[in-house]
C-alpha cells in the first residue's frame, strides 16, 4: 500500500507529497488496509525533532502517512520539484473527514487533551456535525500510565469500534503513543496536536493569511511566549540552515531526475497521439519521483476554441510551462520549438526529451551546450500529405538532426526503426506506446446527442487530415448494403480544404454522423458501443486510437501498413491501403458475419492490454534516458 504514496525526504524524514483532496480520497479508499496503523501530521518542529533524535525518527518514518501540516514543508517539497505538494493541516483534515462521515457512517474516537476541552469539543461537534458518530472520548492523566491502564484504554477504544482515532497529546508524545499501540487498535490513528482545542474553541487558531505566510508559529508564540520562544527560535533557525544545505545537495544529486518535455501541443489534451503519450509518460515519471516540466504551446486548439481550456501551472505533479506563439499555423510550431529550447537551457535539466520530428529541428542547440538529449520519433511526419514542400523539408531536417545528434532515439514501430538504420545507419530504441484496460460505458450520452445504440454504427476516430483516410471510408460506406450508421469523430488539423471536402461529401447522407472533436464520456461511449472500428490510414507512427479501440474490445478493420499490422497481428482484419474496393468488401463481410465480429471482439482487449502497457513503456524510457536500454531492442 505504501508504494501508492509519494514522499519527499526532508532532513531524513519522509513527508507525503499530497493535498487535502488526495488525502481524504486515500483514507476512504484504503481505510481497511490502514486499520491499526497511524498517521503523523508533521511540521517544522516535529521534523527537527526527528532529525535530532534517532528514536523519534524511527517513529516518524514508520507511520503509514506523514502529512505536511506546516506550510514550510510543502514549500520545501515544491522547491525540490514536487510541484503538486500542498498542506494537509490536522485541524482542517478533521472537519473534512467529519463531513464525509455523513455518507460513510464513520465512527470517531477522540483521545487526548483535557476533560474540559473534550466536553466543549463534543458540544461543538454535536452542533456542527449532528450526524457524527462519536464512538468515545478519553482524556488521559498527565502522568505515565501503567501497563494495566494502557491495556484497559486500548480495550475500551476497540470496544467502541472506531474507524478513526484522533490523538491530541502534542508532539512527540502523540506519535510515540501511536507507534507503541500500532496494530493493537481497530481504527486508524491520526495525531493532530492542538486540533481539539481549535475545534472546541478553547484556543484561537492563526488567521488564514498568517498560515499562508508561514507565520502560524508567530501567532502561537504571541499566545504563549514564555514556553515557546526558545523552542521556536532554536527550531526555526536550525531548520532554515539545514534545509538550505540539504537543498543544495539535493539539487546536485537529483539533477538527472529533472526532465523537460518538448514537442507536444499541450497537456492535458487529446489533440493527437503525441499529447496522449507525453501525458501518460510524464504522469508516471512524476509518480516515480522524477520532476517533469512539460512545455505547452499556446494558441489555436486544433479541435476548436471550446476545448482550449486554461490550466493551472501544475497537472498530475507535472509543471506546465506555456510558450507563447503566433496564431499563424505555419509559424507557431517552429517558434514554439525555438523558444522552448532557449528556455530549457536555463532549467538545469538532466534530460531534454523532444517529441516528433518538427521539434527536433532545434535539438542541436542544447547538444551544443552539452545537454543530454533524447528524441522520440512518433512517425515520419514529413511524409504526411497535409504539409507543403517547405514544411516537409523542415520536418526532414528535424529528422536528420535527431539521427545525427540525439543521445538516444526512441521509435514506436519496427518499420521506422528499420528506416533509421537504412537511411542513417543509426541504431534506435523500439518502445511502443502503452494502453490501460478501460471500463465500458453504456450508450447514455451518444444516444441523447446522436441517436446511437450499441452495435448500431461503424466508428472512425482521428483528426480529419488526408493521411488518416476518412475519405476512403466514406466512399466505401456509400457502396455498402447496411442500415448501420457511420460515425466520423475528430477535429481538423490545419487541413481546412480537406475538412470542407469531407463535410461536402457527407451532407446529403443522414446516416453519416460528423461528431466533431470528442473526449471524456462521449469518447468512451463511442468506443464501448461500436460494431466495427475502422482505421484506414495511409501513414501512422503508432496509432493511439487503434490501441484504445482494441482495449475497449472492438472488432477492428485496419489498413495494411506495417505500423498497423505490427500492432494488431492476427487479432483484427486488414485491407489494402488506399483501396476503396477492398475496404468496402471487408466491411460488407463483417456486416454480414456477426460471429466473426464477435470473435474479434472477444480477443482484442486481452490481447492488446497484455501486449502493451504504460508501466513497461516508462521502465524502458527511463532506461533509454540513462543509456542502458539496449540499442535496437
Would you name each region that the model predicts?
Residues 55-63, 96-103, 342-345, 392-409, ...:
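Membrane-proximal helix-turn-helix segments that form the acceptor-binding/catalytic region
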Residues 114-115, 141-142, 299-300, 435, ...:
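Glycosyltransferase donor-sugar binding loop
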Residues 133-136, 499-521:
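Nucleotide-activated donor-binding/catalytic signature segment of Leloir-type glycosyltransferases, i.e.
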Residues 170, 538:
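Aromatic "clamp/platform" in nucleotide-sugar-dependent glycosyltransferases that forms part
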Residues 276, 456, 460, 465-479:
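A conserved mid-protein helix/loop that constitutes part of the nucleotide-sugar donor-binding site
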Residues 517-518, 525-530:
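Short alpha-helical donor nucleotide-sugar binding micro-motif in glycosyltransferases
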Residues 555-558:
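Short hydrophobic beta-strand element within catalytic cores of glycosyltransferases
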Residues 573-581, 589-595:
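Conserved acidic donor-binding segment of nucleotide-sugar-dependent glycosyltransferases
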